Amino acid sequence: MSTHNVFFAAKLGDTHRQRFRQHFLRLNASDLHLRFGSSLNGSAVINYVRGIDCEQDEIYAVTDDAKCILGVAHIVVMEQEAELGLSVLAPARGLGVGNTLFDRAVMRLRNRCVSEVLVRCLHQNAAMMHLAHKHGMEIQHDGTDREARLALPAATSGSHMLEWLQDRQASYIGNLQDGSRLGQSLLSAFPVFGMRPAGKKLVKAGSSR
């Protein structure tokens, strides 16, 4: 009997900085260049993680059964506008991790009454451009840079309820994953609302490839 991976984006905070750092340090030089729009060494990555404002910013992550972070969405909110950066580890690309993170970020921003989300990336970041086109973002060209914007609808009681449900489910599924085999059997047996089975201040340019 085949099983399906179920991806969910869980909110992380200040106590997870070590896991953020481990995630970014697993990206190679090319991945870091696409993610941040410039070349970063290990020290710069550590400084970036140290500088994340977990009180004001929003951080969401998709993890595997071993609690390894497969992908991270870092959202910097600036009043009515927010900037989004995505990164996904190479083995998890093409499975929907980036899309899951994008959807969760948009839902959170909508419910925070943010009117527009912005993504900046290099023109060669084909995966991020694909994600931007897929979600109907308006893309502007500026030399080698691309700037994609998406206007967000106003929050409703329904959008707040959906976010609450997804947060509860993310927590529940995370607890199930701690049981590994039992958790996977339960996830395979029951559909999970809002979750998607696997299918084939320095936030620039998330790499979701």
Q: Locations of the language-model features?
A:
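Terminal substrate-recognition subdomain of acyl/acetyltransferases
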Residues: 1-4, 87, 120-121, 127-209
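Conserved acetyl-CoA-binding loop-helix of GNAT-fold acetyltransferases
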Residues: 88, 94-108, 116, 126-130, ...
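A conserved beta-turn-beta hairpin within the catalytic core of GNAT-like acetyltransferases
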Residues: 76-86, 93, 141-144
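A short beta-loop-alpha structural element at the N-terminal edge
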Residues: 6-19
